[in-house]
Amino acid sequence: MWIGIISLFPEMFRAITDYGVTGRAVKKGLLNIQSWSPRDFAHDRHRTVDERPYGGGPGMLMMVQPLRDAIHTAKAAAGEGAKVIYLSPQGRKLDQAGVSELATNQKLILVCGRYEGIDERVIQTEIDEEWSIGDYVLSGGELPAMTLIDSVARFIPGVLGHEASATEDSFADGLLDCPHYTRPEVLEGMEVPAVLLSGNHAEIRRWRLKQSLGRTWLRRPELLENLALTEEQAKLLAEFKKEHAHQQHKHDGMA
């Protein structure tokens, strides 16, 4: 997968290219990341990249000419088929379904805004899609771009150590992940659930699915509203609710 970055701070992306899962993907040649700074396309000796907005108001906007030139250079490097994305609070909110959708693209160009944003005409003429990582304000688009890259890279074949990891992540099937345990078997009196030590893979799968459904119901119930549960899932969720109510009643009785 090829990803082009338009950013005033391309050095920030060393966190992606040098470390962790994405760093290994870059080293393996599975992920190719290139970056361009609008400053390198400024025409004055101060390398100016900001401009006052028409109509007044606080803050500055990214200057049109250096930004457009950087985008055009990235498009030329990418060749045909590159999707240009602007990281913006006004964009579609990124979720696992969106990540899966973006991962089908072989080429992405991510435009990271700064200051108060970019000229609307640049969005209209250069940007294919706008994406947001949440309803809050950040100083620029670099962190959202890194979030997008990290999440999308997990879908590239060969990036993860286990091919099933991406499909078993939280949200991959619309549910939160189940609890996980490792050694020691007992930690400060808390034991690993016996089913995980049983070696019965069918029961382990059933337990994990039940816990995933239950955790989603407890923490993110709105996610269940969009799911058509299978007969097995509905049964397991009902079991979890019954067990949870019993535990709550038991806890209240001890209080």
UniProtKB/Swiss-Prot annotation:
Broad enzyme group: transferase
Catalyses which reaction(s): guanosine(37) in tRNA + S-adenosyl-L-methionine = N(1)-methylguanosine(37) in tRNA + S-adenosyl-L-homocysteine + H(+)
Compartmental location: Cytoplasm
Subunit structure as annotated in this protein's UniProt entry: Homodimer.
GO BP terms, alphabetized: tRNA N1-guanine methylation
Gene3D superfamilies: 3.40.1280.10, tRNA(m1g37)methyltransferase, domain 2
Residues bound to S-adenosyl-L-methionine: 113, 133-138
EC number: 2.1.1.228
Protein name: tRNA (guanine-N(1)-)-methyltransferase
Domain of life: Bacteria
Gene Ontology MF: a single term: tRNA (guanine(37)-N1)-methyltransferase activity
Primary role: Specifically methylates guanosine-37 in various tRNAs.
A single cellular component GO annotation: cytosol
Keywords linked to the UniProt accession: Cytoplasm, Methyltransferase, S-adenosyl-L-methionine, Transferase, tRNA processing
Protein family per UniProt: Belongs to the RNA methyltransferase TrmD family.
Pfam families linked to this entry: tRNA_m1G_MT
